[in-house]
Amino acid sequence: MSNVTILTPAANKKLTTLEQIKQELEITNSTDDAFLNDLIDRMSGRIEDFCHRIFAKQTYQEKVAGFGDKILILTHTPVLSVLSVLCDSSPITDYEIYNANAGELYRSIGWAWDPTMWWGASAFPSSHHSEQNFTVVYEAGYVLPGDDEAQTLPKTIEDACIQCVKEAYLKRRDDPNVSSEKLGNYSVTYDPTPLLSRLLYNWVRIF
């Protein structure tokens, strides 16, 4: 179990840009810009919900229970940097990012909750105990299209967002799906789940 707080939220969570959408749709005017931006926001949110994860780079504080294992797993990935780790109120520095994409921090003596285990008296995990005694401050996520830094968001995810926005835009007048949303004075009915299931199956977080 863990308890996560966002310390520095992302200013931008759009998984693609208006420019990319207009290029895909071969649109050269600005008539539908506001509508398209709304669709980008909505489809980016739907992708986050579908994948059970936040893709934008943010800074988190996470309280995690240690069970004596050598790996501590953080919720948000990829882990870009770890700013601090505390055991209760004591700083810990003898760790390393073991697998950034899996959110794994490695510590050779283990991440133990019990003080006697912390000092190496035992290497056995105490799985019955769920005290959140480690506090980790870390940065995780991707640089998104439209951010000032070079994009690190995988193109597969951006392409999925582009296709969702494109299909929603083109189905404004004739859509057989059942979910309906209203953007401004225009009603849009579009369910991207089948498309997302096909394109982003490998990106769905299962825990």
What residue spans do the PLM features occupy?
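Divalent metal-cofactor coordination and adjacent catalytic microenvironments
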Residues: 1-207
